[in-house]
Design a protein with these regions (language model features):
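Extreme N-terminal starter segment of soluble prokaryotic enzymes
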Residues: 1-3
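Short hydrophobic/Thr-rich beta-strand motif most characteristic of the beta2 strand and flanking loop
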Residues: 25-31
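Short amphipathic alpha-helix with an adjacent loop that forms part of the alpha/beta core around
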Residues: 35-43, 136
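Cysteine-nucleophile active-site neighborhood
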Residues: 44-117, 182-183
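Acyltransferase
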Residues: 172-193
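Two-component/phosphorelay signaling modules centered on CheY-like receiver
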Residues: 16-25
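Phosphate-binding/catalytic loops
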Residues: 5, 121, 165-176
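Catalytic beta-strand/loop cores that center a nucleophilic Ser/Cys/Thr
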Residues: 113-161
Length: 193
């Protein structure tokens, strides 16, 4: 079972449907309706932290969940969830170079992590006005994808722990290879830690 932390975003259930379509059971909990003990009691095989409005500081249980469970369970952060992963390890979240609400960008990547087998220079939907401050990217994390048009970080992963973040929206119908990226995360959750 995969636990989806809902950050009060309209895209959350698009993610739920995309994951469920791959045969996975998904349990959804709002970021203010579950605590760390509740997460542990559910014993999920993986956690996905959804997009949402605001900043990681306003994302309920998300920062504490990452701080306490990183390395013990695979975690994928999407948009706000991506930012939460960076901030939980000491990264700074800053205003993005450009506000990108419902805009398409070409995404270039290095073929690592979630992008193994994904063609380079694909199109993805972005909905964000905040981004990870690259000089503050925490130790142990690597950038795996960027937006071609503005160079903004579009994906990170941890070199040792199963932690992945994507700033763009893989669940959007307008994102090329979004389903394959989500499938890649699911396949990584099936490996023993």
């Amino acid at each position: 079972m995969i636990l989806m932390i809902d950050n009060f975003d309209s895209f959350t259930y698009n993610l739920v449907q995309a994951i469920a379509a791959r045969g996975e059971e998904v349990v959804v909990r709002r970021n203010n309706a579950i605590d760390l003990g509740g997460v542990r009691a559910l014993d999920p095989s993986a956690i996905i932290i959804s997009p949402g409005p605001g900043t990681p500081d306003n994302a309920g249980v998300c920062l504490g969940l990452i701080e306490n469970l990183a390395g013990t369970i695979p975690i994928l952060g999407v948009c706000l969830g991506h930012q939460c992963i960076a901030q939980a390890f000491g990264g700074r979240i800053v205003h993005a170079r450009k506000v990108m609400h419902g805009k398409l960008s070409r995404i270039t990547h290095n073929g690592l992590g979630l992008f193994d087998g994904i063609p380079d220079n694909f199109s993805a939907v972005r909905y964000h006005s905040l981004a990870i401050d690259e000089p503050s990217l925490p130790e142990g994390f690597r950038v795996s994808a960027r937006a071609y048009d503005d160079g903004e970080i579009m994906a990170i992963f941890h070199e040792i722990m199963p932690l992945f973040g994507v700033q763009f929206h893989p669940e959007s119908i307008a994102t090329d290879f979004g389903e394959e990226i989500l499938e890649r995360f699911i396949s990584l959750t099936r490996r023993p830690l």
